[in-house]
């Protein structure tokens, strides 16, 4: 998996080797046959500072590991700072131990790398580890740096710049969410790829590169979500994270030596250009009826395909009834679902170029004469994203490929796509987050818990700086939740709900009611609680209750939410209004919305048809 993802080498973790039943020479040959090298053997623990017989035993253990390294075919071992209860402190004592071990390693053509564990007994800071290496003054003894061990202890990474690059033998990288907990537990369970957490990994790597370091850049990740994950996905995410990280380093400090080919900058997304539904037959008819009820106009048909365009404000929804090609396959797999997301960007070509550099596969289908070739990639879970820009004429696709059939009226006051909500297994959330934040200029919010009557759903918002593109990721941990049921029944379709913006929620609610829109009925108890939580005028509260509108506030403004009833296996529409810069997504209302939806959907065990 890692060879296919584009990596050059692999570390051998001792526990993995011990669990393997193969000969070390066989392991080495297998790795090299895949075009990889063994860059490091690790970890060798509790070496330095031991007294008397314990010291002799430590050297004996080291010699045995040297034997193993030579059979594997690697020349560098990581020795982490000692946690042994009988280890003695002292920089000079440790330096003497490493100088002697360096002599032994040199006789075999091997090298020693010393790493400061964040929880080491006497050495837990890379500055102290460097001082040990400096005083050992041996060509076969160098420093190993690990971003987690430095950043978790809030050590300034700028101190790395004072270390000679040729004395740094190896660099390991890991990010992590900003938790306050025991360092060892944090490290063993919550490390993740650079960019997936909250540590200043870019600043760390800038400091490393400023030393002149030219050695391997590795990932050392311990994470409960990864342990049972797909090796191919994890490897691709790891490579993606390193490409994005080194690109960030290059842009942050251009004078540093380049370590990777230049790629276009993160794409500036200006919004959702279109959403395309794969559907057929009676399900397509029902979807189009719902769109009409929402105030959309069937404004155009594709000139050569079974595609209809539905518009309102700046919103474009495409209903695809094709019986062959990607959309037909998507329908067969997922049922009625969003099969394609069109994103408006500053440069479609540059966006795809960056996506490919990050490991995404391009996507293309045969096109008819007169059609535009719109750049596209495969996203997460096999989804497709097309990119549209103004400068290349791609935004003219609606006039070029579609024939008008009606003129859109005002509809119900919907103006644009506020956000889309994508659902995935919780174990896949980090991968989805990394996909968006490395490809687009987007920032992620903290992960929050959404209470479902049947379990927890983890939710994270990812936004462009101006809010033009907003995506919420919802990670389901059990199939019993609303999100989990959607995943199970749609075979992992991604878009579960589409939030559409209005400038006047009450006028929109009235217009929807006139068209026969069936709003999600909200419990009257909700509005009693709302009156207690917020200082709302009685008349406003009555209008909210009458229209089944939910309400929230933050420090800046207010948020109004109106939901459709679920359709097509658990998808739904949301109509929202933001006032005065409200920046959230109505999170406090989610449990009440989910409970209302669950009262309407069919019970588990009852077949669809």
Question: What positions do the PLM features span?
Answer:
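Acidic (Asp/Glu)-rich catalytic clusters
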Residues: 2-4, 19-42, 61-73, 96-107, ...
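Glyoxalase I/VOC metalloenzyme domain signal
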Residues: 251, 256-300, 311-364, 376-444, ...
